[in-house]
From Swiss-Prot:
Assembly, per entry: Part of the 50S ribosomal subunit. Contacts protein L32.
UniProt xrefs under PANTHER family: LARGE RIBOSOMAL SUBUNIT PROTEIN BL17M, RIBOSOMAL PROTEIN L17
One Pfam assignment: Ribosomal_L17
Signal peptide per UniProt: none
Keyword field: Ribonucleoprotein, Ribosomal protein
Any GO molecular function: structural constituent of ribosome
Any one annotated GO CC term: cytosolic large ribosomal subunit
A biological process term (GO) from this entry: translation
Name of the protein described by the UniProt record: Large ribosomal subunit protein bL17
The family this protein is said to belong to: Belongs to the bacterial ribosomal protein bL17 family.
Highest taxon in the source lineage: Bacteria
Organism: Xanthomonas campestris pv. campestris (strain ATCC 33913 / DSM 3586 / NCPPB 528 / LMG 568 / P 25)
Gene it is expressed from: rplQ
Xref: NCBIfam families: L17
Family annotation (InterPro entries): Ribosomal_bL17, Ribosomal_bL17_CS, Ribosomal_bL17_sf
Length: 127
């Protein structure tokens, strides 16, 4: 019985899951918008939101903690320089999950994961 066992396994080993969410969180912090399956998006919240909370207070200990969880210098730098100050007054709820239909190959439910309050860049219209 799996009573009180939180988290999804995704038919992966624990190391594979950890690496997958580490990479997804780093990509999310770099690009501020990623597309993935809906269950992975929901599980990514459990990884990314605490990291943004850590990023709100810049310091050596917090940077080392974030680097230990992300293993990506560029993502950690952006987390503390850009994202932490942006969400300094927000008490959680840093991610938005938007459903994005179904994947063509296997009909898996897809979703966009984006950081709330991200600056929207106007796209150029090619003529």
């Amino acid at each position: 019985m799996r009573h009180q066992k939180s988290g999804r396994k995704f038919n992966r080993t624990s190391a594979h899951r950890e690496a997958m969410f580490r990479n997804m969180a780093a990509s999310l912090f770099k690009h501020e918008l990623i597309k993935t399956t809906l269950p992975k998006a929901k599980e990514l919240r459990r990884v990314a939101e605490p990291l943004i909370t850590i990023g709100k207070v810049d310091g050596v200990a917090n940077r080392r903690l974030a680097f230990a969880r992300l293993r990506d210098k560029e993502a950690v730098g952006k987390l503390f320089v850009e994202l932490g100050p942006r969400y300094a007054t927000r008490p959680g709820g840093y991610l938005r999950i938007l459903k994005a239909g179904f994947r063509a190959g296997d009909n898996a439910p897809m979703a966009y994961v984006e950081l709330v309050d991200r600056p929207v860049v106007a796209e150029e219209v090619s003529e």
